[in-house]
Amino acid sequence: AAESQGLSLVTPPDDAAAQGRPLWQRISWPKIGLFIVSLYLFILALTLMKDGARGLAPLVQDRFSLNNAFNTMGFGWLFAYVVMSGSPVAASALTFLDAGIITPIQTFTMIIGSRMGASFIILFIGFIYVLRGRNRSTSLSMGLLSFTVTGSLQIGSVIIGTLLLRSGLLGRFSLGNGAALTSITDVLIDPVSGIFKNTLHLPAWGLFLVGLGIILLTFNLFDRCLPEMTIKESQVGRVSRLVYNPLIMFLLGSAVTLVSMSVSVSLSILVPLSHRGFVRRENVIPYIMGANITTFIDTLLAAVLLNNHAAVSVVMAEMLGVAITAMIILLVAFRRYERGALRFVQWVTEKNLNLALFMFSIFLIPIVLILI
């Protein structure tokens, strides 16, 4: 009975009477209120990080050798390991760009690094299951697939996104002038941010760290705003038929992550189906591809709120780079790509030495990138 309660993409009614209630009575108003609070805190955090980043410019330039795009990629990668999340690091990259600390290309590679670092989170959760005595291959496969798919997509994105940024094509497009939005948010945010800047007299690094802490809290609150999605017993058969279509899984991954703004959260929705054998590892690959595109929605929102056209262009280059790479793979060589990814995951998990080499490499690579 517990299994039949599962996750629905619509909130299941408690009973027939609940289903007949008006829509406004079925809406979770506390979650809407929490979403509004989360959005306010997100804008406040971004404002504090932006103000802090401007004052941090000399410190970052003196203490960190962010001289090229490789350095910023490694920095973003390790930064995401430290905070166990990619979105705050991507937001930090945009505030660094806005402060003139790094260039658009460096911002682009720092965001790429943040995605690589964020992929480690799912892998880390898998390690916790292994320590609890679960099967190593089963526990680590989702995290390894996420890391592998994300890494391969980002390789394509580096090439395509860099070409887009250097060509200036994205400069012809605009999401509109953010000045009106900025003026509205200034009225709501400035009194609170002024407390940190003028009353508490926090230094630049303090403002940035407070903003980073608030934005980490914000993404946690965003997760709590999500509707409780379940898959009812009657829907399992229908869903299990859909998972064998790569394009549908790609679109599903894009849609779910668009709502959740987190790859790890959207992947967790598949866990009940995976445990019951309805979703195999190969079915998850196109889902992860789609998730890797729409996970940048929160970063795009941050770029718009900064009212910085270069920041918007950078995020658009990243999203288009990942999307074009994913579509090429899906339409041209998906089955070969699928076999290659599964073989790599199997190789990593079959021996302790292979797993150790993989773990060593994902920490060594960002360090080497920083030192280049």
Model-derived segments and their meaning:
Residues A17-M73, P191-F250:
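Helix-loop-helix hairpins and the membrane-proximal interhelical loops
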Residues Q19-S28, G52-F79, V83, P88-G100, ...:
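Transmembrane helical cores of multi-pass ion-transport proteins
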Residues G33-L48, F75-W77, V149-T162, L207-D223, ...:
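Hydrophobic core segments of alpha-helical transmembrane domains in multi-pass membrane transport
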Residues F35, L39, F64, N68, ...:
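Alpha-helical transmembrane segments of multi-pass membrane proteins, especially transporters
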Residues G133-I155, F296-I372:
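C-terminal transmembrane helix pair
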